[in-house]
């Protein structure tokens, strides 16, 4: 028995063809990089403080990403790159020893100077070897405090970057304006300073890090007071406390928290 058929008039398209075309478009359309954004945290910073060029929604299918000083991807402007297949970063000619590249694409500057001010560009190389650049800028202004006047504890702030994060991503508990006259800094899980809750401490006189019972091997403490979490889980969600020990042995606790949500499939 022959199958019935209908003759198409000019301008008509078979519905099967439409479905097939739509299916192919849906299947073959690659994920765009339009959702990728980069922000400077903070965008305006005082000299000798820290800046994070925070990347949101970095594609997980990249071969490698690069950070450059300025708008050009010239070799002498390369700060560093991160190769995803081996989970390793490599520093470039423009690296000053104060920059750190994270696996989530973000670039951290420690103790910025006026010379660091300007434009930086993230170059993303995908599986098809296509390059997508995204630029960001931050400004550096001189400190308004006299050079002999140490920062007060009232100026110290701690923020979670980002405050809401998907499982498996990274978080930085970023400390602004940490006093330089501290004896030590401590990080605790929760809002109280207890031995069992200690993640790590940094002894300023000896430039030494001591890990605590609550350290999970995924946290890194920096000498600027910041605490970095790699590959967070739902169990990491909650409050943390920065404890500053001053020269007169006074303590000041500063709480901060972040939320962890399930990764979108």
Curated annotation (Swiss-Prot):
Keywords: Glycoprotein, Immunoglobulin domain, Repeat, Secreted, Signal. Its main location: secreted. Pfam families: V-set. Abundant in seminal vesicle and traces in epididymis and prostate (at protein level). Highly expressed in seminal vesicle, minor in colon and placenta and, to a lesser extent, in small intestine, caecum, stomach, salivary gland and bone marrow. Residues 1-33 form the signal peptide. Residues 35-142, 155-262 form the Ig-like V-type domain. GO terms for cellular component: extracellular region. Glycans are attached at residues 44, 87, 224. Belongs to the immunoglobulin superfamily. CEA family. PANTHER family: CARCINOEMBRYONIC ANTIGEN-RELATED CELL ADHESION MOLECULE 1 (PTHR44427:SF1), CARCINOEMBRYONIC ANTIGEN-RELATED CELL ADHESION MOLECULE 19 (PTHR44427). This is Cell adhesion molecule CEACAM10. The gene is Ceacam10.
């Amino acid at each position: 028995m022959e199958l019935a058929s209908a003759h198409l008039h000019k301008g008509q398209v078979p519905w099967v063809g439409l479905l097939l075309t739509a299916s192919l478009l849906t299947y073959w359309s690659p994920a765009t990089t339009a959702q990728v954004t980069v922000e400077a945290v903070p965008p305006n910073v005082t000299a000798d403080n820290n800046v994070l060029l925070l990347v949101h929604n970095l594609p997980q299918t990249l071969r490698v990403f690069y950070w450059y000083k300025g708008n050009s991807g010239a070799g002498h402007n390369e700060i560093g790159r991160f190769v995803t297949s081996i989970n390793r970063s490599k520093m470039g000619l423009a690296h000053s020893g104060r920059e750190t590249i994270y696996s989530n694409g973000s670039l951290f500057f420690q103790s910025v100077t006026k010379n660091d001010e300007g434009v930086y560009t993230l170059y993303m190389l995908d599986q098809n070897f296509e390059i997508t650049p995204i630029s960001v800028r931050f400004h550096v202004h001189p400190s308004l405090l006299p050079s002999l006047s140490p920062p007060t504890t009232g100026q110290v702030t701690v923020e979670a970057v980002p405050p809401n994060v998907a499982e498996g991503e990274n978080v930085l508990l970023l400390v602004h304006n940490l006093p330089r006259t501290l004896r030590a800094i401590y990080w605790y899980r929760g809002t109280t300073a207890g031995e069992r809750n200690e993640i790590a401490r940094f002894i300023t006189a000896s430039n030494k890090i001591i890990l605590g019972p609550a350290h999970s091997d995924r946290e890194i403490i920096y000498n600027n007071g910041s605490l970095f979490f790699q590959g967070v889980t739902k169990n990491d969600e909650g409050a943390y406390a920065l404890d500053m020990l001053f020269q007169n042995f006074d303590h000041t606790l500063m709480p901060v928290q972040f939320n962890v949500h399930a990764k979108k499939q």
